[in-house]
Amino acid sequence: MTDVSAAAGGATAPAETAATSSSASKPLTNGANKTSTAMAAPTATPTTAATASGAAEAGAITSVAGISNQVKLEHHHHRQSNNNRPVAPYPPVPAAKPKPTPTPESKFKSTSREPGMSSSSSSAQQDVDEVARLFEEKPEAFEKWLTERAPPEALSRLQEFIESRKPLKRPSVTSDLFQQWMSASPTVQQKSPRSLSNSSASSTLPECRRHLMDLDEGELFMELIRDVANELDIDVLCHKILVNVGLLTHADRGSLFLAKGTPHNKYLVAKLFDVTQKTALKDAVTRASAEEIIIPFGIGIAGMVAQTKQMINIKEAYKDARFNCEIDLKTGYKTNAILCMPICNYEGDIIGVAQIINKTNGCMEFDEHDVEIFRRYLTFCGIGIQNAQLFEMSVQEYRRNQILLNLARSIFEEQNNLECLVTKIMTEARELLNCERCSVFLVDLDCCEASHLEKIIEKPNQPEQRPTRAIMPGDSFDEKKMRNRFTVLFELGGEYQAASVSRPSKTELSTSTLAQIAQFVATTGQTVNICDVHEWVRDHNQIRAESEIDSTQAILCMPIVNAQKVVIGVAQLINKANGVPFTESDASIFEAFAIFCGLGIHNTQMYENACKLMAKQKVALECLSYHATASQDQTEKLTQDAIAEAESYNLYSFTFTDFELVDDDTCRAVLRMFLQCNLVSQFQIPYDVLCRWVLSVRKNYRPVKYHNWRHALNVAQTMFAMLKTGKMERFMTDLEILGLLVACLCHDLDHRGTNNAFQTKTESPLAILYTTSTMEHHHFDQCVMILNSEGNNIFQALSPEDYRSVMKTVESAILSTDLAMYFKKRNAFLELVENGEFDWQGEEKKDLLCGMMMTACDVSAIAKPWEVQHKVAKLVADEFFDQGDLEKLQLNTQPVAMMDRERKDELPKMQVGFIDVICLPLYRVLCDTFPWITPLYEGTLENRRNWQDLAEKVEMGLTWIDHDTIDKPVEEFAGCADEEIKDIEFTVTTLNCNQQAQHGAGAGGDDSHTPEHQRSGSRLSMKKTGALGKAVRSKLSKTLYNSMDGSKPKTSLKLLESHVSEDMDDKSPTSPSQPHAGGSVGRMSASSSTSSAGTVVDKSKKRSKLCSLL
């Protein structure tokens, strides 16, 4: 780095003395073109484009007929008139002899020969004239020659010529320039050859300068402003500014400094230094990059200008104390006059400083005119510099976003390798921020096995007992350090050094200054940007300085946090490559890297935890598979048992019941179904494997009240009956029959006695695992688990294609038992049936048919005989009531009616609704298509009548359930016949008109004074008037229910007295002229002792009295 004070003034190229006057003294060529000094470097300017287009035009014409230089000049004049702007390096036509704008035809017809043309050029021009005349006489032949016989090279050049005829636009932020920046290195901008190479333009530089010197001051000023107005390459722009300022002020050389740093630590960086009008852009950029000059604000001439924002004009540099003559002494160049001026943006902030040295026109100092021109031109240059910086920032931001996107992609690509991920992040950070070293410290996160076991044995809803690593306000620094200990260190050195991973010891961490700084950041959670490490360590007594910081100048250290804002590591950058401190922009970029590093570390740890959990799951599945599989003794016993015929189990009948079958008989019945369908031999199922699988399936059903193994057996038997008796096997393949029977047996595996809604409400693991058809998906997974268990795969002999097919059938069939799926598929099935569909072999139609068959089998208990059906219904209701109790207890919510134990009397009514909504429509449409399963439909109709009759009796006030559980059928209530009912007072009301007429004379009354419940209709009502138990009232209701059926009462009610209350008669006025519409009211009281009248009523009299009332 060049000394700061030496950079304040002076020059470095003795060979490039003030010699531009020699070139300026040469005579100017007449008609020098108006052009910009951009020809010093071939950038994206009109000058370069015009030069290239002129060459393209000349090449295109020459390829056709050997065009001369005169044609090229005429074409250039045509371009100039079209674009209305100067083009270099061709001189314009003298003003005294204006030439009209040539047309394309005139180029070929022109035969004039201007002075200076050679004889060969004259001959070429004659050839052009001859060809032009031929083209004019026979244009069709020329067109045909172009389209059929013209060489491809000629056509290509001609196309380029035509394209070049279009007017040029002013240069802007073209895609080429943007792509040039995109392909540049993140740390060192790689300039394109067009920007850095000015070899082609250097040869035309004297002509450009001579042309510009021929302009008046106003035209020159505007031309130079146009030259820099749209330039976005900061290096090219600065070079243009210095060259143009030299032309405007006749300065020998100049330097341009750009302001950098934070608001509290600003400095100047020499973008280009000692640039003369002959200095090539590439040389200037190379020299500035090789020896970067940094000048703090307030130091030297340029530093003072930046500090004060005031211009400095020095007439004799050696007499000014701020001037440093060391560079002059090294180079032999003598600095006389210096003019240094600030460059500000639109807000008035310093963005740079421009400095010019020595006059070349014989003057010894810069006068006021030079100062004014310099100030005016730098005003416009400030706008251009800020635009170029904004563009550079946008490009850098784009590069940064691309790097961050790559890092995001790397997080998922390297999630199984933390070392590779962190190394990649550090490499990207080092290259983008241009630093020497990069380190990442990882904090111990208590991932040891002991803490894991502590976590497992923690009780639910209990505070965490493990020591926390949270930093408390009252903790000392040492206590905070003890809570954050680094366990892994990633280090990345220079560009050619490989990354290293180590596990530092406590001694190494306590003796390393860099580690202590990282420990400080992890403890405080603050970002540290250290410009001077030695000074920072002196200010923090708790950190000890070691010898390793001798080579460390600047450090940027930042915490890495996870989603819970807990520090999991520290990222550290050491020393910028150019020796300057880290800026706020660097900290902002590094923050993004720290965030991605935290995401990567967190994601990797999550991935490792997931892998561990998967391993634990495999172990658990192995254990579960072992315990879920039937024992070898049970398998051997079932294998040796004799299997009865299907008729002995009544498997062909739709009235099958399992009540009389023992558990072993249920397994034998399943085996008989497989044997009867010829599945064992058809698919080569080993008999012992089939027996073990059946026993394992039975073992994996929970002992719930309804959805247990026997329910699965009934569903499978109904499917067997539909296939055999219902003759539906003709629509199925053997593989589909196998899948359907397996699905029926497994469709409720591991049922917990609760439905999908309960799983969702309680947010159970099953609901998290399966968002739709929760239990059905679990049943299928259990089915797969059993099949995958050793010795249970009954599909082992199937081909891969058949295996996939049968598993698809099993999955679809089990999921179809979800009534939500039934309602989705029902309309499509009904539409097919209504359209007279008879071909069910299509994949979608077969899936619909199997789904409807599964639902029909699942609810087939509704079609069983009444003595079976009402028992099963009570089991279902009891299971539902248990779920309702759980909802009240766990969720503190009121369950729906069918699960509310308090509304159990509504069960008959709900059964009727279930039959009407689901069962009857399904069986009706199936019977229409497959008439052999009509018994299912007829049985459902019969049970509906029974449930409807029971529902009507419940509406009359009869209670059909007399206790909390409903495992007893209605008929079993007869066992209470010998019990005596005591202390019952009830009222019986009837609207029998004949009886009303008979008793009206004695108890007649006005209808308006009759209670409404006595006028509401012919019904029997029970009303509790004392401390009467619920069981007693239920028994009485049952007795009356039997009496209403005409059967003999089974309970001997000892009615001791029947009388009419005198109080009621007194309060009910009667009128002989009006009929008694309210009915007769009788109050009867039963007591164990004799009544007040001493009259005892026996059972037969009681029955006669009730019958007469009813």
Curated annotation (Swiss-Prot):
Chain intervals with Pro residues compositional bias: 88-103
Comp. bias (Basic and acidic residues): 1006-1015, 1056-1068
Protein name: cGMP-specific 3',5'-cyclic phosphodiesterase
Pfam short name (any one): GAF
All copies of domain PDEase, residue ranges: 631-954
Keyword Hydrolase: yes
Comp. bias (Low complexity): 1-25, 35-55, 192-203, 1082-1097
Lipid attachment locations (S-farnesyl cysteine): C1107
Keyword rRNA processing: no
MF terms (GO), sorted A to Z: 3',5'-cyclic-GMP phosphodiesterase activity; metal ion binding
Record PTM Cysteine methyl ester, positions in chain: C1107
Keywords: Cell membrane, cGMP, Hydrolase, Lipoprotein, Membrane, Metal-binding, Methylation, Prenylation, Repeat
InterPro entries membership: GAF, GAF-like_dom_sf, HD/PDEase_dom, PDEase, PDEase_catalytic_dom, PDEase_catalytic_dom_sf, PDEase_CS
Annotated GO CC locations: membrane; plasma membrane
Sequence positions that bind a divalent metal cation 2: D748
EC number(s) per entry: 3.1.4.35
Membrane topology value: Lipid-anchor
Compartmental location: Cell membrane
Function noted in UniProt: Has a role regulating cGMP transport in Malpighian tubule principal cells.
Residue span of region Disordered: 1-55, 67-128, 184-203, 997-1028, 1040-1110
Chief location category: membrane
Compositionally biased spans, kind Basic residues: 1100-1110
